[in-house]
Amino acid sequence: TLSIFLDLGGSVNLDEFKTDNITAVEVHEDADIKKNKLLKSIFPDIARKLKFNEEGVELFIKVTNDINDHNKKDQEKVADVFTPKKPIITYALIIINLFVFFFPTFMGNFDEVTAYLGSFGPFVKMGQYYRLLTAAFVHANIAHLLFNMYALWIIGMQLESFIGKWRFLVVYLFSAICGSLLSVAVTPNALSVGASGAIFGLLGALLYFGYHYRIYLGTVIKSQIIPLIVINLLLGFMVPGIDNAAHIGGLIGGCLMMIGVGVKYKSSNFERINGLIVSLIFFCFLVYMALFA
């Protein structure tokens, strides 16, 4: 976003507007615009667009109206992205996870469901590829389930509202599969269950989304999301029984697929295509490492 301040009375102090996410550039004449590398890199055609036929008051009115129109459109886009929406997919995923845990528990065959749906390297290599996805809906115990569902509710309801239902679902499922694949590659003889790989994927997607909207989410990303990821990964290395490979695979997969599905109003088609290509390469690499290496 380019904001222009007119210093008509010598009262504009640019230092007031400088933050980690905002760069203030002082311009006295047209030549200053052409010399500034930052402006030229972000707005390569700004010099051409600043050429007007109007002069004096007419030029001032035209520039003011253009800026107001542009800011209004930007505000409408931001409102569209950040206005809360009902997180239907998040609720559906939570319900499925609860059903998969409690129904077989009440029926007395919980261990069988875990054995049939969990990710286990030898069975996956025998052709039971469905386990790579179904493992994300199975949990070892009630504490495991409640912890993951709380995390899914907190993170999912925000991210789904930001990026939309279909993007959210694609990121979630892709992250779950990537997490299972890396888990099979690193610990092939361990039974892996849980939604944490997919949830880490949501965190990876939130990182990329937050980068594009860093003027609004920059502080949250740096003070909350990144520390949360780092702390949980460190715990995964220190506490036995945690499948950190699934966490890392999901985190990377979620970030890459978020690039592929794109951030509304921010991502170009070029970025989306590159994101999908890199996601496919990463997926193929994981398949090779898990099934053929």
Q: Predicted regions span which residues?
A:
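Hydrophobic alpha-helical transmembrane segments in multi-pass integral membrane proteins
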Residues: 234-246, 284-293
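Alpha-helical membrane-inserting segments
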Residues: 99, 103, 178, 182, ...
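N-terminal signal-anchor transmembrane helix
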Residues: 1-132, 220, 265-280, 284-293
